Swiss-Prot record:
Highest taxon of the lineage: Bacteria
InterPro entries associated with the record: BH2638-like_sf, UPF0223
Cysteine-cysteine disulfides: none
Family under the similarity heading: Belongs to the UPF0223 family.
Organism encoding this protein: Streptococcus mutans serotype c (strain ATCC 700610 / UA159)
Protein's recorded name: UPF0223 protein SMU_1141c
Taxonomic placement: Bacteria, Bacillati, Bacillota, Bacilli, Lactobacillales
Coiled-coil intervals: none
Gene3D superfamilies hit by this protein: BH2638-like
């Protein structure tokens, strides 16, 4: 895993959309590097899904993000859904 990496962003997104996607990806990073509130991650994921509505694009972003960072958005969301309340930590 490398600390200096490019986020998988679509340059056609608005500044607000990019901010929402980055917020979600930052929370995924936080889940792996420390811990994050499950409800906060799920709320951010809902916002993310309004921007990235297709499953194909979501999978591509997850795959690209995991390739460059080592962190899976899918695994983070699944852990948050299983926990619902409290904090999750996916530290390696």
């Amino acid at each position: 895993m490398t600390k200096n990496y490019a986020y998988p962003l679509d340059l056609s997104w608005s500044t607000e959309e990019i901010t929402s996607v980055l917020s979600f990806l930052n929370l995924v990073e936080k889940a792996y590097e420390n811990r994050v509130e499950a409800a906060l991650l799920l709320k951010s994921y809902q916002n993310y899904k309004t921007i990235v509505s297709s499953k194909l694009q979501e999978k591509q972003i997850d795959r690209n993000f995991e390739r460059v960072s080592g962190y899976s958005t899918y695994r983070a969301v699944q852990a948050a859904k299983a926990k619902e309340k409290g904090f999750i930590s996916l530290e390696n």
